[in-house]
Each structure stands twice: as structure tokens, then as C-alpha cells.
């Protein structure tokens, strides 16, 4: 069964270190681990890497469409390779989870995440897997009583201490990926969620 792991982010050097690109960081780390490279694929509106996982095809995708149009890329690749929504894992940044924590779930709402909204529209279902990497909320981090604009926050690089925590959650996500891809999603969730 062909699987797809999508990292969400914004293309371009100016966004490489933004919190909003945590999904890209995850699939970049996975590609390195698997020894594969991303290649630009215009027909899929993104960069694609193809690997084998226990004899099955595994695609990694970084949409080049900007976050809010990610569904265009995901939909094109899924239609071409006949990948079902339940075989998709979308890796995203999550404001409502503290840095260092990650959560795995199937389906659910978009939580205001425009990338997820667009993917859901293109797949015509919310029933795909999400790996939510905590980046924290600006109200928790500002500390000076003044609210920080969410859009401004996600488009900035994290502080060094936050980055280390996000990197830990990426490692934790990579560590449960084997369980997830084998279909042992309950154990994968328990292991990941026990990390914090």
C-alpha cells in the first residue's frame, strides 16, 4: 500500500527557519534518514522524494504552493498515485501544543490551520492522519502581557530553546514512524504522547 507523508510549510529561503515550516523540517529529517532527495515535480506543485518502506512505496512531499494552497499539491499527487486519505500523514506546526510535544491523530477539525483546510477541501474528507508538532502560542511566550499577532509569530524563527524542543518533538515523531507505517497506530500514539 502506497503511503504519503506531507510536510507543511512555505517555500523560499526567507521562510526556511519560520515556525510555520516545522512540517518541512520533519520531512527533511526523514529524507536524510532514508537517504533520499527531494526533486521538484511541477505536476505535483511541490518537491517529492520517493523511498521504499518494507517493500512499499513511500512518498515524501513538500508543497511549493505556500501553506494556504497545500491541498492543490497533495490532491494532485494522491490522484496520480491513487493514494487513499487514510494512507496520508500530514505533518504540521501546532500553536495549541507546547514546543517539545507532538500529537498524532486521525481526522478532526482544522483548528484554523489554512493548510489543513485546503487539504481537506481537495481530499473531500478530514479523515487523513496528522502529526502535530508543537510550536506554542504567542500568548504563552510573549510574557510581557502584550498579545503578539499569530501570523507574525508563525512566520518568525523560534528562539534557540524553543528550536531545541521542536527538534526533540521531530525526533520523537521519527521514532514512532515505523509503528505508524506498519499500521500499529495505537502504539505509535501511546509512545509519542507519553513523551510529553
Curated annotation (Swiss-Prot):
Residues where tRNA binds: 15, 66, 68, 114
Compartments reported by the entry: Cytoplasm
Site feature location: Stabilizes the basic form of H active site to accept a proton: 93
Keywords: Cytoplasm, Hydrolase, RNA-binding, tRNA-binding
Gene3D superfamilies, sorted: Peptidyl-tRNA hydrolase (3.40.50.1470)
GO BP field: protein quality control for misfolded or incompletely synthesized proteins; rescue of stalled ribosome
Superkingdom in the source lineage: Bacteria
Entry GO terms, CC: cytoplasm
EC annotation from Swiss-Prot or TrEMBL: 3.1.1.29
Site (Discriminates between blocked and unblocked aminoacyl-tRNA): 10
An example Gene Ontology molecular-function term: tRNA binding
Coiled coil residues, start to end: none
Active site, renumbered: 20 (proton acceptor)
Protein family (similarity comment): Belongs to the PTH family.
Alphabetical list of HAMAP family matching this protein: Pept_tRNA_hydro_bact (MF_00083)
SUBUNIT field: Monomer.
Protein name: Peptidyl-tRNA hydrolase
Species in which this protein is naturally found: Polynucleobacter necessarius subsp. necessarius (strain STIR1)
Gene assigned in the entry: pth
Amino acid at each position: 500500500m502506497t503511503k504519503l507523508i506531507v510536510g507543511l510549510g512555505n517555500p523560499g529561503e526567507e521562510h526556511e527557519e519560520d515556525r510555520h515550516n516545522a512540517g518541512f523540517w520533519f520531512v527533511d529529517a526523514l529524507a536524510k534518514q532514508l537517504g533520499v532527495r527531494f526533486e521538484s515535480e511541477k505536476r505535483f506543485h511541490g518537491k517529492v522524494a520517493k523511498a521504499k518502506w518494507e517493500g512499499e512505496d513511500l512518498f515524501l512531499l513538500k508543497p511549493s504552493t505556500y501553506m494556504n494552497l497545500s491541498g492543490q499539491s497533495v490532491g494532485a499527487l494522491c490522484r496520480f498515485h491513487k493514494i487513499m486519505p487514510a494512507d496520508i500523514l500530514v505533518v504540521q506546526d501546532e500553536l495549541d501544543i507546547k514546543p517539545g510535544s507532538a500529537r498524532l491523530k486521525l481526522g478532526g477539525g482544522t483548528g484554523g490551520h489554512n493548510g489543513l483546510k485546503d487539504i481537506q477541501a481537495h481530499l473531500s474528507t478530514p479523515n487523513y492522519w496528522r502529526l502535530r508538532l508543537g510550536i506554542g502560542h504567542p500568548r504563552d511566550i510573549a510574557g510581557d502581557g502584550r498579545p503578539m499577532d499569530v501570523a507574525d509569530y508563525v512566520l518568525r524563527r523560534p528562539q534557540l530553546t524553543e528550536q531545541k524542543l521542536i527538534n526533540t518533538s521531530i525526533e520523537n515523531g521519527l521514532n514512532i514512524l515505523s509503528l505508524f507505517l506498519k499500521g500499529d497506530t495505537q502504539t505509535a500514539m501511546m509512545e509519542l504522547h507519553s513523551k510529553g
